[in-house]
């Protein structure tokens, strides 16, 4: 579908959308075009009733509210672009409204659970296995910095300042920021760079910081698997992936007294409202502790 390839280029070059967002949008639009074909319609016959029918089909199949909201965002971006290109006479999605997604409190680790997970990863790396050294760095760096897993996998060696314990991150919308990390993450980084990465590096590795078993840049899906498997080692810890470590890092920073705007900068949130979600997590955890510990709770 050449038109989707052109739209993908538009999203990447003119809108600065991340690869993750573009992949999700294109998947939604392929679904829409398949729906159109099933009705015997062409793209220039796309209308508001057709869009509503497509969304209703997804809702009937059990699509989550957040999925429907993303589908609407995808189609609104696409139809506005297609109208601008002259491929649509009017924008049929202009009147579609994105439903407000429910904001749920994310699952987070207790601080003692986070320490147990880091200890388990360190223990696994003590034999010097290259993949175990890498896996320790993955969980340490995600928890230490709160960066996204896509940002972690996109790091090059030169993005890490080992002397000052800083990492330069290219985030959403191609916005660059710097995140500090502590001594444990620095120790994991040193072990990986000295003993792990050299054992896996190939001509295909390039400048990538993290590598897969075949020497290529580590894939996001592989990193997710590593986190899930490492967290599962700790009894009682909630099942979570990289985003759970990001949630936990933010919550623990706030519990430790960090300023909300500092946390916003560290996480790369464009809106303070997004960061404020973590204050609700911290307060709810405070309430649990208070209820359990205070004699007059």
From Swiss-Prot:
PANTHER family associated with the record: PHAGE INTEGRASE-RELATED, TYROSINE RECOMBINASE XERC
Active site: 148, 172, 243, 246, 269, 278 (o-(3'-phospho-dna)-tyrosine intermediate)
Compartments reported by the entry: Cytoplasm
Main location (coarse class): cytoplasm
GO MF annotation terms: DNA binding; tyrosine-based site-specific recombinase activity
Official protein name in the record: Tyrosine recombinase XerC
The protein's role, per its UniProt record: Site-specific tyrosine recombinase, which acts by catalyzing the cutting and rejoining of the recombining DNA molecules. The XerC-XerD complex is essential to convert dimers of the bacterial chromosome into monomers to permit their segregation at cell division. It also contributes to the segregational stability of plasmids.
CDD domains the record matches: INT_XerDC_C
Biological process, per Gene Ontology: cell division; chromosome segregation; DNA transposition
Pfam short name (any one): Phage_integrase
Subunit structure: Forms a cyclic heterotetrameric complex composed of two molecules of XerC and two molecules of XerD.
Family: Belongs to the 'phage' integrase family. XerC subfamily.
InterPro entries documented for this protein: CB, DNA_brk_join_enz, Integrase-like_cat_sf, Integrase_catalytic, Integrase_recombinase_N, Integrase_SAM-like_N, Tyrosine_recombinase_XerC/XerD, Tyrosine_recombinase_XerCD
Annotated Tyr recombinase domain residues: 104-291
Annotated source species: Mycobacterium leprae (strain TN)
Keywords: Cell cycle, Cell division, Chromosome partition, Cytoplasm, DNA integration, DNA recombination, DNA-binding
GO cellular component terms listed in the entry, alphabetical order: cytoplasm
Gene that this sequence comes from: xerC
Domain Core-binding (CB) as annotated: residue spans: 1-83
